[in-house]
From Swiss-Prot:
Major localisation: membrane
Gene Ontology MF terms in the entry: ATP binding; MAP kinase kinase kinase activity; protein serine kinase activity
Enzyme class, first EC level, given as a word: transferase
EC number, UniProt record: 2.7.11.25
SUPFAM superfamilies: Protein kinase-like (PK-like)
GO aspect biological process, one term: defense response
Residues in the signal sequence: none
Polar residues compositional bias, start-end: 184-201, 752-764
Chain residues that bind ATP: 437-445, 459
UniProt organism field: Physcomitrium patens
Domain Protein kinase: residue ranges: 431-684
Protein name in UniProt: Mitogen-activated protein kinase kinase kinase 1b
Length: 764
């Protein structure tokens, strides 16, 4: 007899004994023995057979039963109903067959392998018993005392089913589920019985299947309404939909559909109460497409389905363009072209059902609050055409000039001290977000592509409430957008536009594919000519900013991008600031390792020359392959710079480069050169330095240097060398194959001597 030992190691056959020693050992060979017993198939399955003599090695008993066998208990799950097979096995089995509608096991259409596995599952998956006392070892053990079943698994298994694997359930969408339900309601008896094996053909319901209530209940109306929204070209009405899709609103279902993605015509506040009763939002007395406006004003949004994964544009959905091709054009034609502001609702008169004209100049004047029109003017032809086109659309009492397709707020957040941000719409209608590129100062940057195949960078910024820190970040983001919207320079990343939704703001920028200088000098050794070419372009972009009284305040290699032509572009204007006439600032902004002494000292003011100090640190970073003060932590750097100490300049650098860096890192602000002065330095012009360099400001070079920077960006490739004898351009500053091996390692000597840390360890 095979016994189950009460050992704590027992788990599904772990303590079964073998048939040779009668179960006294724990070799774990009981499971193969039982499998061989099942595979014999020497008996026919007979319901009337007496199974009481089934006491061979295949039977299972618990040692805690003291010789008396427990009543077996087996459980079968059939169509979410539980049926137990007890001691009266014969009658219970007949009842079980009657329940499932079969007369013999072969009618169950279960394959032979499934028959064995399901039999084992019934026998060996009984609930856990209470702790029992092992008779052999005399100690308590919490074993799984598997209760036996008297089902004879040695009996003849039924024939294999035509399908060896169960058919996966057919997943239906909303429209198919509704059609499937209607098929059940109006089902006709069929000639065949049972489920077909083909998943493409549905089985008919049984005759006793309960009929569905086809009355227009709330669920039925809402489901029908959602179906009409997706299938019919007719616009839905404001309020709950009737079963027939008419404009009659059902009060009991008002506001029960909170997940609709449709928007409807709305009116300004303090209007009739029926709009609140027919609101699509659950009992909150607010329309679903309401936008917070001054003086309780409401504005209608586009009824086009909006796709959050693409863009916030009203014409970005291809399905909506096919269903309503003229909607966006009508909305744009009826919108106010110069301003999207809505007049004060308190000063707005009671509007008639029909309007005489929708011209913007007539609506710009605010009439008296108590004035009433003497007669109803004729309705605008565009409103009539729109009503005829959409059939059941409720006639709105809003002037069509106030019905705009898309509301663009004049600024992201109202911060009093920040410049106003006018949203610039990108030149595309549909765009898709691609791979993650990196993280900027206030958001993550992704790659994007528009419907015409143009690639760009997308900075994604969350607009959720993040406390005081989040408000400050949004405020600085306003500065970045305001500054970038007015900047057009080949050495500054181009701003393409913005879009926003309820939670995020998307800033579209020019995509610069080769990454930042910080990532490039880790891959390549920047030689002298490369550093000189990049520095000249950085100076060109800085001069453009300084001429417009803009301080970048975060110049470093990580914020300078390079394209495939070797043109550098200043990026990440989150720290930039446009100063007043005095040009002085006191705010503590920037990265510690690149900060000027006057920026670190809170008692001192600084101006555009703070960017010159950061430029010197950036040139030193490109030359050495590491950040300035790379071996120090931020607080140590701030202490050193605050006391007037600059980063150490290696002695093995070229004289022109060392002199250029030392002049940029001048502690005294009055002795620090400007961009115009640095553009005449021998390190930039390529002339040999014969003695101490004395920089003299040359105003006449302002226009020339800017023109040269434009010529530089338009050069076809950086691999061509300059043939003229004048100051070389960026193309002439490029590295030729012969000059690569001149000083490949000289500018990286200091990195190994001082064991500087990588820029990733420096918090910007």
């Amino acid at each position: 007899m095979v016994e189950e030992r009460g050992s704590s190691r027992s788990s599904r056959g772990g303590s079964w004994g073998s048939g040779e020693d009668g179960g006294s050992s724990h070799g774990g060979k009981g499971v193969p023995k039982l499998s061989r017993t099942v595979a014999k198939k020497i008996h026919k399955y007979d319901v009337s057979a007496d199974h009481s003599d089934y006491e061979d090695d295949g039977s299972v008993h618990s040692t805690s039963s003291s010789g008396s066998r427990r009543n077996p208990l087996s459980k079968s799950i059939i169509q979410q109903q539980s049926f137990r097979v007890g001691a009266n096995f014969e009658e219970d089995l007949k009842t079980l067959y009657e329940l499932i509608g079969v007369s013999k096991p072969a009618d169950l259409a279960i394959s032979a392998s499934d028959w064995q596995s399901r039999g084992k599952s019934i026998a060996y998956s009984q609930p856990l018993s209470s702790p029992s006392l092992s008779q052999e070892h005399g100690e308590a053990s919490h074993s799984n005392d598997l209760k036996p079943s008297i089902i004879d698994f040695r009996s003849e298994a039924p024939a294999a089913s035509p399908r060896e694997l169960p058919v996966a359930p057919v997943k239906l969408d909303a429209h198919e589920r509704m059609t499937y339900r209607s098929d059940y309601v109006n089902s006709q008896p069929q000639n065949h019985y049972g489920r077909k094996n083909s998943p493409s053909q549905r089985s008919p319901p049984p005759e006793s299947f309960p009929a569905f209530d086809s009355s227009p209940s709330r669920l039925g109306r809402e489901g029908y309404g959602l179906h009409r929204m997706q299938s019919d070209p007719v616009m839905p009405t404001l309020g709950a939909l009737s079963p027939l899709g008419t404009g009659n609103a059902h009060p009991e279902s008002a506001g029960s559909t909170a997940t609709r993605r449709w928007s409807f015509d709305l009116v300004p506040g303090n209007h009739e109460g029926d709009y609140a009763n027919m609101s699509q939002v659950v009992r909150d007395n607010l329309p679903s497409a309401a936008v917070a406006m001054p003086k309780n004003g409401l504005v209608r949004r586009s009824p086009i389905i909006r796709d959050p994964n693409r863009s916030n544009s009203s014409v970005s959905n291809p399905y909506a363009q096919r269903q309503y091709p003229n909607l966006a054009e009508e909305a744009e034609s009826s919108a106010k072209p110069e301003s999207s502001a809505i007049p004060d609702s308190s000063a707005m008169p009671e509007l008639p059902a029909k309007l005489e004209s929708t011209a913007v100049p007539e609506l710009s004047a605010k009439p008296e609050s108590n004035a009433k029109p003497e007669s109803e003017p004729e309705q605008d032809s565009s409103v009539e055409a729109r009503t005829e086109h959409y059939g059941s659309v409720r006639k709105s009492k809003i002037p069509s000039a106030l019905i705009i397709d898309k509301f663009e707020e004049p600024s992201i957040v109202s911060t009093g001290r920040s410049p106003g941000v006018v949203s610039k719409r990108p030149p595309w209608d549909t765009w898709f977000k691609g791979d993650f590129i990196g993280s900027g100062t206030f958001g993550s940057v992704y790659e994007g592509i528009d419907n015409n195949g143009m690639f760009f960078a997308v900075k994604e910024v969350s607009l959720k409430d993040q406390g005081k820190v989040g408000q400050e970040a949004i405020k600085q983001l306003e500065h970045e957008i305001a500054l970038l919207s007015d900047i057009q320079h080949p050495n500054i990343v181009q701003y393409l536009g913005t879009e926003r939704d309820d939670e995020k703001l998307y800033i579209f920028l020019e995509l610069v594919s080769k990454g930042s200088l910080a990532s490039l000098y880790k891959k390549y050794y920047f030689v002298y000519d490369q550093v000189r070419a990049y520095t000249k372009q950085i100076l060109s972009g800085l001069k453009y900013l300084h001429d417009r009284k803009i301080i970048h305040r975060d110049i470093k290699c990580a914020n300078i991008l390079v394209d495939t032509n070797g043109v550098v572009k200043l990026a990440d204007f989150g720290m930039a600031k446009q100063v007043d006439k005095l040009g002085l600032l006191k705010s503590f902004m920037g990265s510690a390792h690149w900060m000027a002494p006057e920026v670190v000292n809170p008692k001192r003011q600084y101006n555009f020359l703070a960017d010159i100090w950061s430029l010197g640190c950036t040139v030193l970073e490109m030359a050495t392959g590491d950040a300035p003060f790379g071996e120090l932590e931020c607080h140590s750097v701030l202490w050193k710079v605050g006391n007037g100490e600059g980063p150490l300049i290696p002695d093995d650098l070229e004289d022109e480069m060392k002199d250029f860096i030392s002049k940029c890192l001048e502690v005294t602000v009055g002795n620090r050169p400007t961009c115009d002065m640095l553009l005449t330095h021998p390190f930039i012009t390529g002339e040999p330095m014969t003695g101490p360099v004395k920089l003299v400001p040359m105003p006449e070079l302002s226009t020339i240097s800017e023109e040269r920077s434009i010529d530089v960006s338009e050069s076809p490739s950086i691999a061509t060398s300059s043939q003229s004898g004048s100051s070389p351009s960026v193309a002439g500053d490029a590295v030729s194959p012969a000059s690569v091996a001149v000083r490949p390692r000289s500018m990286r000597t200091l990195r190994s001597e001082f064991s500087m840390s990588s820029p990733e360890s420096i918090a910007s």
